[in-house]
């Protein structure tokens, strides 16, 4: 069956309420027959249009608006009104709309979320619901949920503790699960766990929609998380994917290690960021013509993103034949207190793994001059951290320096694409976390900065995991994903400065990632969906969400003529 063909869908809804159901509403695309039989004739203008015209109308309204925040609100209103049309709009130009529904605009939306809140798009579960989380989950109208994105709002992008306002992240993330990965949106559930906030402005804001007290921590917090994980898995199944998003460093690794072997879970800030960064590095190596194990990598930042990338680089270097110990020696990290070295005070267990025998240093410029890295990766959300001197030094040490400014949003980027290319005279191999415009150099070349967006990773991973019912998600999934992404980058893309496939191909990239995950899952006996499909690509494709409107008219058909004869008299 062609997955693009209209699907027949049964509903008891009729009349006005049907037009208020975003899963069923077609707006002006309802045919005359549908309008009459579904009792909505007269509620809509007489004009009947197809979805293509509807998309054009949305884009026209979108382009009339002056701010990205207003554009975000327009798209969120559309999602609340007509789900199929919303995703059709996103998929019509992913490169244009992704920065609005996700980074960088979603950061501004989260800061304004208390003002922008209009209707429920997910579940808010507070610490005071402890002991009753299963009951709160019952409030969600969908019985089948295969993917959850959950946050506690403590570390939203590079913006810090936004508490309940962080709900914009799970909502935006799951929108990309569907637009980029084809995961059914009705099977996705955004959740915010509200345990309070340390944000003074929010605590004093009378319009703040969350709990107005300090964050609950320690054993009570852990018991709350344990209950949530147990309740969600009990209700939706042990194969329900639970993605952790924007938890603070002190909890992110701890919770991942605690739950990864019991539930189907991953942390996108750690593992997703790692995968997309390593994908960029693998693509960059096709330019430098050497191996990953030949690199010396310096991180500005030592939080969950940096450590996640570092661990995946080690795994990739091991695959090239290097020992774990030697691989770790090629990785250096700088945190807020300076270079991470052995004997330095207050090192966490995760940071200790990458501590070197070296003198203590604090100044990043001096550290770069001393270490002479071949690759410099920024994930500390310190805007402008890669100074002109650092960029000059990187270009002096390397013919083709690898410079990744991965912090979000744009204001937190370590340097801009233009700064990087101009200082290095176009020799830098650059990638960023937020989008930057193409840069034209004095010699006439135009370079297109690669955007190392996690959206290349998590939609495909989610699609693959959900499709085959993968029970646990290990780190090899993310190395495999990085390899698949890098393989989609053509030589022409590399010449243009792109380290990632064009965003308009992201749905195809996600399909390839998902198919590889499904293949490996069955090969390693980790899948739970049986019988095993013979054609894995066809199997995954058949499960991808279609934006074509469903057929919701009653299933009408005829009987044979002889049985339809009207009896007019009783036989004696």
From Swiss-Prot:
The keyword Phosphoprotein applies. Its cofactor is Mg(2+); Mn(2+). The active site is at residues 102, 173. Pfam families: malic (PF00390), Malic_M (PF03949). Gene3D superfamilies: Malic enzyme, N-terminal domain (3.40.50.10380), NAD(P)-binding Rossmann-like Domain (3.40.50.720). SUPFAM superfamilies: Aminoacid dehydrogenase-like, N-terminal domain (SSF53223), NAD(P)-binding Rossmann-fold domains (SSF51735). SMART domains: malic (SM01274), Malic_M (SM00919). Ubiquitous. Up-regulated by 3,5,3'-triiodo-L-thyronine in the liver, kidney and heart. Divalent metal cations. Prefers magnesium or manganese. The modification N-acetylmethionine is found at residue 1. NCBIfam families: PRK13529.1. This is NADP-dependent malic enzyme. It comes from Rattus norvegicus (Rat).
């Amino acid at each position: 069956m062609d997955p693009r063909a209209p699907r027949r869908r049964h509903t008891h809804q009729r009349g006005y309420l049907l037009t208020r159901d975003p899963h069923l509403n077609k707006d002006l695309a309802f045919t005359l027959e549908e309008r009459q039989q579904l009792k909505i004739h007269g509620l809509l203008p007489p004009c009947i249009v197809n979805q293509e015209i509807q998309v054009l109308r949305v884009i026209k309204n979108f382009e009339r608006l002056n701010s990205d925040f207003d554009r975000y609100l327009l798209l969120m209103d559309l999602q609340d009104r007509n789900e199929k049309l919303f995703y059709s709009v996103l998929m019509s130009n992913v490169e244009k709309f992704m920065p609005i529904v996700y980074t960088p605009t979603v950061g501004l939306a989260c800061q304004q979320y208390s003002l922008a809140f209009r209707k429920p798009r997910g579940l808010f579960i507070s610490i005071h619901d402890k002991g009753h989380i299963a009951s709160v989950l019952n409030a969600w109208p969908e019985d089948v949920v295969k993917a959850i994105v959950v946050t506690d709002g403590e570390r939203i992008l590079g913006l810090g503790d936004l508490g309940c306002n962080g709900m914009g992240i799970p909502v935006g993330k799951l929108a990309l699960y569907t637009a980029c990965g084809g995961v059914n949106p009705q099977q996705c559930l955004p959740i915010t766990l509200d345990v309070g906030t340390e944000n003074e402005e929010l605590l004093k804001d009378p319009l703040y929609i969350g709990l107005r007290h300090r964050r609950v921590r320690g054993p009570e917090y852990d018991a709350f998380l344990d209950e949530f994980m147990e309740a969600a898995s009990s209700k939706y199944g042990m194969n329900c994917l639970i993605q952790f998003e924007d938890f603070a460093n002190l909890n992110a690794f701890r919770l991942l290690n605690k739950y990864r072997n019991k539930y189907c879970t991953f942390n996108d800030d750690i593992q997703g960021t790692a995968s997309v960064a390593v994908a960029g590095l693998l693509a960059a190596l096709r330019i430098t013509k050497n191996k990953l194990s030949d690199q010396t990598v310096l991180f500005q930042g030592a939080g969950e993103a940096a450590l996640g990338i570092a661990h995946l680089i080690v795994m990739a270097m091991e695959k090239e034949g290097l020992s774990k110990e030697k691989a770790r020696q090629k990785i250096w990290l700088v945190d807020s207190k300076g270079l991470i070295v052995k004997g330095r005070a207050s090192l966490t267990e995760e940071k200790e793994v990458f501590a070197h025998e070296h003198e203590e240093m604090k100044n990043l410029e001096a550290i770069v001059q001393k270490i002479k890295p071949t690759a410099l990766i920024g994930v500390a959300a310190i805007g402008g951290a890669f100074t002109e001197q650092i960029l000059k030094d990187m270009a002096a040490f390397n013919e083709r320096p690898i410079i990744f400014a991965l912090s979000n949003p744009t204001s937190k980027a370590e340097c801009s694409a233009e700064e990087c290319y101009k200082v290095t005279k176009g020799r830098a191999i650059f990638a960023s976390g937020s989008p930057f415009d193409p840069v034209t150099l004095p010699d006439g070349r135009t370079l297109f900065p690669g955007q190392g967006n996690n959206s290349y990773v998590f939609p495909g991973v989610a699609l693959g995991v959900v499709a085959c019912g993968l029970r646990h998600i290990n780190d090899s999934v993310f190395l495999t994903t990085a390899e698949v992404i890098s393989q989609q980058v053509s030589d022409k893309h590399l010449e243009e400065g792109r380290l990632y496939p064009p965003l308009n191909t992201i749905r195809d990239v996600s399909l390839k990632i998902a198919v590889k995950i499904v293949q490996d899952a069955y090969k390693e006996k980790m899948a739970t969906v049986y019988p095993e499909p013979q054609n894995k690509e066809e199997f995954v494709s058949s499960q991808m969400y279609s934006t074509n409107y469903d057929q919701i008219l009653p299933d009408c058909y005829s009987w044979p003529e002889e049985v339809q004869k009207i009896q007019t008299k009783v036989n004696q």
